[in-house]
Amino acid sequence: MKTPLVTREGYEKLKQELNYLWREERPEVTKKVTWAASLGDRSENADYQYNKKRLREIDRRVRYLTKCLENLKIVDYSPQQEGKVFFGAWVEIENDDGVTHRFRIVGYDEIFGRKDYISIDSPMARALLKKEVGDLAVVNTPAGEASWYVNAIEYVKP
């Protein structure tokens, strides 16, 4: 089950997506469906078929975003978090081979399209929670345990 947390920036982006879909893209696609339907035979009308499918996709995403935004809890930065890994932190980690990664721990609905974001529900994020710089985090992976050292922790301050 995914944790219903989101950063303020993530919440605003989801709201922007919902507004764009509802106010701009959906009306445009609806016009295309109406135009294509006016041409007659809908069974062999590629414009009609494609835009009808796109309209269903938009409606599905709008329903999801509407429900999602109602249930999400915005987590803002708190000075008490400083120095430890919590939700919203940018974390730099390093393994024994010197391989480093930098990412932000965010809600499930914020990670899509971002390679530098990981979900709070991921094994890596769970292993890193409450760690400080210099601490060792042991992550259970399908290939076994992986050890990572925390190099840096940063927060986006309002």
Swiss-Prot record:
Membrane-crossing residue ranges in chain numbering: none
Q: Name one GO biological process term.
A: DNA-templated transcription initiation
Q: Which domain of life is it from?
A: Bacteria
Annotated Pfam families: GreA_GreB (PF01272), GreA_GreB_N (PF03449)
Please indicate if the UniProt record lists Secreted as a keyword: no
Q: Which UniProt keywords apply?
A: DNA-binding, Transcription, Transcription regulation
Any one GO MF annotation of this record? RNA polymerase binding
Q: Which NCBIfam families match?
A: greB, PRK01885.1
Job description of the protein: Necessary for efficient RNA polymerase transcription elongation past template-encoded arresting sites. The arresting sites in DNA have the property of trapping a certain fraction of elongating RNA polymerases that pass through, resulting in locked ternary complexes. Cleavage of the nascent transcript by cleavage factors such as GreA or GreB allows the resumption of elongation from the new 3'terminus. GreB releases sequences of up to 9 nucleotides in length.
Output the PANTHER family linked to this UniProt entry.
TRANSCRIPTION ELONGATION FACTOR GREA, TRANSCRIPTION ELONGATION FACTOR GREB
> What family is this protein classified in?
Belongs to the GreA/GreB family. GreB subfamily.
Annotated protein name in UniProt: Transcription elongation factor GreB
**What organism is the protein native to?**
Escherichia coli (strain K12)
**Gene coding for it:** greB
